[in-house]
UniProtKB/Swiss-Prot annotation:
GO BP: bacterial-type flagellum-dependent cell motility
Protein name per the record: Flagellar P-ring protein 2
Source organism of this protein record: Vibrio parahaemolyticus serotype O3:K6 (strain RIMD 2210633)
Subcellular location per the Swiss-Prot or TrEMBL entry: Periplasm; Bacterial flagellum basal body
Assembly, per entry: The basal body constitutes a major portion of the flagellar organelle and consists of four rings (L,P,S, and M) mounted on a central rod.
NCBIfam families linked to this entry: PRK05303.1
Family as reported in the entry's similarity comment: Belongs to the FlgI family.
PANTHER family per UniProt: FLAGELLAR P-RING PERIPLASMIC PROTEIN FLGI, FLAGELLAR P-RING PROTEIN
Length: 363
């Protein structure tokens, strides 16, 4: 019987009751973030694995027209070495013109593979429609595909998505509010009122009283110098301050697909008794032949004979006293050889009965 593995996500695993963390590890500066860029382009040079869709042909003709090449009226180029693609990139904060970023290229048509292709010059735009980077280069595709003359086909990984390392050049800097105003705001990665207040107290102990204040469960506002050069040194000192974040809320995370169960250390059980068993129903159909006596005038017929067998496992009962943890429950379930699915069913029943002090989240 597969045993249940319980992961206790608890700071009690460390040597101290509360583990100090740097501000930069639990919070980020408001406004200092990456920005997503996207563009539409063409990949050329494919070994017959491209496409001949109408929008690809239209894009191909428009590209030729930009180079002064006009196709004769009514001409439809039959191209199999070109594919229409979407190009995406993430522009890090404070990126400057001339710096390079990685891009991801993915087919949006019926191309079979992008392996061996080259992305032609593609403008990457932000949410405001402005061009912030230009991408171009040879694709690296980890997937592959092969097709035989009889229609047999082999595909490995995903051959219609490729990467270009440092494939886009930044052309424009995105404005950043970092140097404006009298305050810098830190946003916690995990919202918590206690953590926000402890962080503000740590900053005040370092800078002086009333220099920082917790705005809500997420944001901590710190008074900062207006000079940008001083602000960088100021922020460097602040983000390396250490303090003790609050313990997380009592949660149980259950992955129903893998059977993984993660339990926080503050989860407790109220007094409860649980019994859990299983029933198996097996139906077997037998066909019997009914043969009448000679000269009786009867007919030989086939008569179905159903055999139904029901087996029910003995339900094991667990009784818990006040203050016990989920670790005690898992240990008890493991002792009787139950499966992870049994523990999931027990957890759901306990939560519905109000016997679990914490959140039960099933993913």
């Amino acid at each position: 019987m597969k045993r249940i593995v319980l992961l206790l996500m608890s700071v009690a695993l460390f040597s101290t009751a509360a583990q100090a963390a740097r501000i930069k590890d639990v919070a980020q500066v408001a406004g200092v973030r990456s920005n997503q860029l996207v563009g539409y382009g063409l990949v050329s040079g494919l070994p017959g694995t491209g496409e001949a869709n109408p929008f690809t042909e239209q894009s191909f003709a428009a590209m030729l027209q930009n180079f002064g090449i006009q196709l004769p009226p009514g001409t439809k180029p039959k191209i199999k070495n070109v594919a229409a693609v979407m190009v995406t990139a993430e522009l890090p904060p404070f990126s400057k013109p001339g710096q390079q970023v990685d891009v991801t290229v993915s087919s949006i048509g019926s191309a079979k593979s992008l392996r061996g292709g080259t992305l032609l010059q593609t403008f990457l735009k932000g949410l405001d429609g402005q061009v912030y980077a230009v991408a171009q280069g040879n694709l690296v595709v980890s997937g592959f595909s092969a097709e035989g003359a009889d229609g047999s086909k082999i595909v490995g990984n995903n051959p219609t998505v490729g990467l270009i390392s440092s494939g886009a050049t930044v052309e424009r800097e995105i404005p950043n509010p970092f140097g404006r105003g009298d305050y810098i705001t830190f946003n916690l990665l995990e919202s918590d009122f206690t953590t926000a207040q402890r962080m503000a107290d740590a900053v005040n102990n370092f800078l002086g009283p009333q220099m920082a204040s917790a705005v809500d469960a997420t944001s901590v506002r710190v008074r900062a110098p207006r000079d940008v050069s001083q602000r960088v040194a100021f922020l460097s000192a602040i983000e390396n301050l250490e303090f003790d974040p609050a313990d997380g809320a009592a949660k149980i995370i259950v992955n129903s697909r893998t059977g993984t169960i993660v339990v926080g250390k503050h989860v407790r059980l109220k007094p409860a008794a649980v019994t859990h068993g299983g029933m198996t129903v097996a139906i077997k159909e037998n066909l019997n032949v009914s043969q009448p006596n000679s000269f009786s005038g009867g007919q030989t017929v086939v008569v179905p004979d159903s055999d139904i067998e029901v087996t029910e496992e003995k339900g094991k009962m667990f009784k818990f006293e006040p203050g016990l943890t989920l670790d005690d429950l898992v240990r008890a379930v493991n002792e009787v050889g139950a499966a992870p699915s049994d523990l999931m069913a027990i957890l759901q029943a306990l939560k519905q009965a109000g016997a679990i002090e914490g959140q039960l989240i099933i993913i």
